[in-house]
Amino acid sequence: MLQFTPPLQPATLILRYKRFLADIVTPAGEALTIHCANTGAMTGCATPGDTIWYSTSDNPKRKYPQSWELTQTQTGDWICVNTMRANELVNLAIEKNQIAELSGYNFVRKEVKYGEENSRIDLLLQAEDRRDCYIEVKSVTLLQQQCGYFPDAVTLRGQKHLRELQNRVVNGHRAVLFFAVLHTGIKQVAPARHIDRRYAELLVQAQQAGVEVICYGFQLSPDGIELNTRLPLLQDEMLSSENAE
């Protein structure tokens, strides 16, 4: 489990704005502006009136020492809105040998430069007796019609990552797109063709080329976050959306 130390503190969300900032009010009535480590649309994750949970940094140089970590929605779901946690969570689960699909590697390297488009891979797994495994981690928090969708906004960077992963397979390596589902209401995942059509098309191409897609849910609470169970990727969702157009 990734434990929050010191413990997270609750507050009520007033407004998220300028992508990286949010205004909140603590139970004691103190108004704070906190940092939001999420560049996405955060659809359904930032409704005014939601209970949010924040951490506090001991770095005196930070202008906004508090960071928004979790949202507890008014419907009872938990969401991790800090996208920086996704890589940390997947790396921790790999080190603890909790992901069977990614077991058997001796070394884990982070943020390694690679590819033809000046990219950095989130995680690179290596072992003497197997191919290098390149892992790109994506945080999934958009819930619509009982399904989790990625991305929640058009992502040219995400499109680039799919091209890079496909090239890794062409060059003889193993490549994995790992969807870290950080919304407890999501039980299945699909590409958001209605938001970023090109990303959905590239995902199909990448899978056909041999890129693996793995989706896992996580248990979330103010105490910490822990890997839960594997979730399905809806292939039929891609095909039906394509055929309907």
Curated annotation (Swiss-Prot):
Family, similarity comment: Belongs to the SfsA family.
Superkingdom field: Bacteria
UniProt name for this protein: Sugar fermentation stimulation protein homolog
Stored Gene3D superfamilies: 2.40.50.580, 3.40.1350.60
Organism: Yersinia pseudotuberculosis serotype I (strain IP32953)
Pfam families according to UniProt: SfsA, SfsA_N
GO MF entry, a single one: DNA binding
PANTHER family: SUGAR FERMENTATION STIMULATION PROTEIN A
